[in-house]
Amino acid sequence: MIDLSSPGAVRLDPSGFEALVDAARHGSAGAPLEAKEALADERLDGVMSVMLDPAAVLRLVVAGPDTRLEHRGWLADGVLVLLLGVRTDLLQLMKTPPAFLPATLVRLTRMRPRHLPERVPAQFAAARLDELVSPDARLRAPALAEANADFAWRLDFWWDGGGRSLTAVDGDLGLRFAYPEVGRLVPVTNTFGYRVLSTVMAST
C-alpha cells in the first residue's frame, strides 16, 4: 500500500516501501502501478536518490513493553529523508531540512520537562541493553521492568568512517542514558538530552 491521497508525507506499509525502493533502484518498468505513481509524485523529488546513496544513515527504535516502533533516516546533499513508524503496519515518508532533526528526535523520544526528585545511577549490564529495544516482547518487557522504565530508545547514526550509538530509558524516574562501559543507567536532564541529540550529526 502506498497512499498519495493526503497532503504532506507519503503514507505506506512496509511492503509498499520495499516496492518503492526496488522500483527506484532497478527501474520502474516492472514495478507495481502504485510504486510508479509514487515515484512521479513531486513530494518524492530527490528523496529516493538520498536513500539510495546517503552520506549518513540513522535508526531510532522506541519501545515499551507492548509496542515497538522503528524510525529511519538518510542524509545527503543537505536533504534529510525520514521514514517514520506510525504503527507497525504504517509508515510515513517525508523529507525535511537537516536542521529539524533534533526537534524530530525530541518528539519521537517523548522528551519533556519534568520536576523529579534527586536520582542516582542504577546498575544495568551492558550485555542486556539490546533487550530494552528487542523486537521480542518476551525479552523487552522484563528488561524494561528491571530498569524501572516505561520505555526505552536506541539511536544509531552511521556515516562514512564512523558511527554513534545511544541507548536511553524513560519513565517515572525520568530520562537516563546508558553508559555500557560502566554498566549503568545514569540520570540526565532533558536539557542535556536535547544537547546530545542536537550534536548527532556533528561528525558528518
For the regions a protein language model found, what residue spans apply to each?
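Short, surface-exposed polybasic-aromatic patches that bind anionic ligands, especially phosphate groups
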Residues: 1-204
